[in-house]
Amino acid sequence: FPDKDIIEFPFTEEKMNLSGALFDKDKLHNICKNELSKLSEEELYDFLYDWAKENEPEYVEKWFGDREKMLQILRLYMGVGAKRRRKDLMYAKQIFELISYFFDGESAEEMDEFKLDEDMVSKILKSYLAKYDHNDDNSVWFNKLKEIADEHGFASDMKAYKANPENFKGNVSDIAEAVRIAVTGRANTPDLWTIVHIMGEEQMTERIKKHIK
């Protein structure tokens, strides 16, 4: 056995086989995905906090200043506490990049483009804010998206849209996508109703107003 502490033996790749399993990123990432999915809510929170404190100390207060907000985000994105856990996230930096839009001053590196033209997006977002009530549950909230669809010539009924798509400008999913991109900068996210309730009405409204002409 060596008689010196391990820290006195600096790690070097020079005499190692770089094609071995230790340097196989795919295998390493696969292990990380599985291990992250096993962490409890508190363990995952602590893991991310420790990583941020060491690697991104300037963001610690922003990310972790509201403990309950971060826990809600992790429940949504990682499935913490749910029957099915998300198993495609591999490391802390990836997770923070994914959830960055929840925090003011941060956004996706490249905002996804709206499929609809600016005028239509503006009209949809105006209607959305006019009808929005933060106390609405998910069902009532989505029914209001359907109302907006009908008001602007989009199909609220997917069966009707599939039967005669030429009769409509689009469907209710296009309405939801316009709101989603305005709020998060991304066309694909987890449940939008949950996202806006984690963010809060004020933050959501400020972001939407930036896209209203």
Please state what every model-predicted region is:
Residues 1-110, 114, 184-213:
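Catalytic adenosine-cofactor/nucleotide-binding cores of aminoacyl-tRNA synthetases and other
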Residues 4-11, 74, 100, 105-106, ...:
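Short amphipathic alpha-helical segments and their helix-coil junctions
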Residues 27, 44, 91, 141, ...:
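Residue-level detector of well-ordered alpha-helical segments, enriched
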Residues 31-35, 131-132, 152, 182:
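Alpha-helix C-capping/helix-to-loop hinge sites
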Residues 113-157:
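Long, amphipathic alpha-helical coiled-coil segments characteristic
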Residues 146-213:
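Charged substrate- and nucleic-acid-binding regions of tRNA-handling and nucleotidyl-transfer enzymes
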